A protein has these predicted regions:
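Pyridoxal 5′-phosphate
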Residues: 1-155
């Protein structure tokens, strides 16, 4: 049996593992965000599917040689990971400071190591180097997707 030591000492909340009072404002904010998602899930999913469709169409009509990493259907609707042949993702980002992209998974954002997820998929190093994640938000527009494709084409 392993005994866990408290992160902080104090009032004994969280079974004596982490003392401290939760922020009421943050708790209310989380509740409102959950309510918003519950109330608007279909609307948001439709929006993300439209954005993904626009992105795929614009990629197909571009001069870019690209490949989608992972299954196109079995993924969350607002997320796509692609590799562009002959490009290094980190170098692309230097020319597009106005566009937020990531070459790692969301949980390793900011690290300089290659993606453990793409490595586990047995992708070659060149493909991993050219891979990046595109995540859309509720306010992402089709015009922003077109701007992304233009930037990737160095236009």
């Amino acid at each position: 049996k392993n005994t866990l030591r408290p992160l902080m000492s104090g009032g004994g909340q969280e079974m004596n593992l982490r003392s401290g009072t939760l922020s009421p404002a943050l708790c209310v904010g989380l509740g409102e965000a959950c309510k918003d998602l519950t109330d608007n899930r279909e609307k948001y999913t439709k929006h993300f599917e439209e954005i993904k469709s626009s992105l795929l169409s614009d990629l197909e009509n571009s001069n870019l040689e690209y490949v989608i990493n992972g299954n196109i259907e079995q993924r969350i609707p607002n997320n796509l990971n692609i590799a562009i042949k002959g490009k290094v993702a980190e170098q692309l980002f230097n020319f597009m400071p106005h566009i937020a992209l990531s070459s790692g998974s969301a949980c390793t954002s900011g690290t300089i190591e290659i993606s453990h997820v793409l490595s586990a998929m047995k992708l070659d190093d060149d493909r991993i180097d050219g891979s990046f994640r595109i995540s859309a938000g509720r306010k992402t527009t089709k015009e922003e997707i077109k701007e992304l494709i233009k930037s990737l084409n160095n236009e």
